[in-house]
Amino acid sequence: MNVQTRRLGLYALLLGAGILAPFLFPNYVSQIAILWIMILFALTWDVMGGQMGYNSLGNILFFGAGMYASAIVQIGLYYDVGDYTSAFGAVKVDFTFAQYLTGIVLGLIAAAVISALLAVVFGWIVFGLRGPYFAIGTLGVAIAAGEMVSAWEWVGAGGGISMPTYPGEPDDRSLIFYFLCLASAVATFVFLRWLYSTRFKLAINAIRDDEEKAEAMGIHTIRYKTVAWAVAAFFLGISGSIFGNMIGFIEPLEVAFPTVTFGIFMVVMSLLGGKGTIWGPILGATLFHVIKEVTWTYLLGWQWVALGLLIIVNVVYFQQGLLGWAQDRWPELFGIVVEDKDKADTADDDSIRRAAE
């Protein structure tokens, strides 16, 4: 059995487990659904933070933008959004199955496209910053977005907005959104897996390793940074649309733009598993989500202490993440050939040259 066959077998096993999970664990459907969203968070943050070395603290902006874009489209197709939100939930729009599904599909498309466009626009503003200045700049943009939406009366301001109600059985609704969460995470993984097999990965890794050298070799760094952020925003917008519909209500600061929770979680999960890899963010998201759910259930009141200790252990003892630590400790298990420094430097230069061709 060759490596490719084993890899396909692993993918099939994991996908099968994901499909069977809501039937094997019916009492934990929502928790497992959120796990897929967490995996998507970690994967998309790693596009910029791990592969390119630009640590964004504002990716939650695209999650919230997708959520609101989807809500506006889904409601606006059949009702005036301003009248709907000004009624403070007193007005309920009755949807047929056809109307509801049409709204979901168009809402997903709008969420993805608008979030990607926002990444392009804000990229022009913040990509002149580097290092901690970029991180702080993106954090400021995300916080400002949440505050602006909180003051926007047309979409409910701080009172939020209710999503359209599913016109069917609650159990069916749970399964629909579970599989939408699963599909979004799988689509993100598959697309990034393909993207990282192209010259695009060589280019963004070259930017991470030495941006000045990459520019000197002919790599259009602004273009690659913009595309990378737009790709991450595209999938984050989709996840925002799905999550908003799944919980049924959007509140700007705690649900759509939760900078101090989901916004930080996506960074921590990628670092925990090992940034700059495809499997590290998945491992980190899974471990983090399990620990979070266990502490929220059995250590209520101490859950933030437990998560804080997890972050401290990660930073002190596993600076390369769990996957990076395992690769350093047992490189032969991962097919890694240990090279001396001169050969490694030569390989880096060759990678930059290939990316610029």
Where are these regions (language model features)?
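Transmembrane alpha-helices and adjacent helix-loop boundaries
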Residues: 1-357
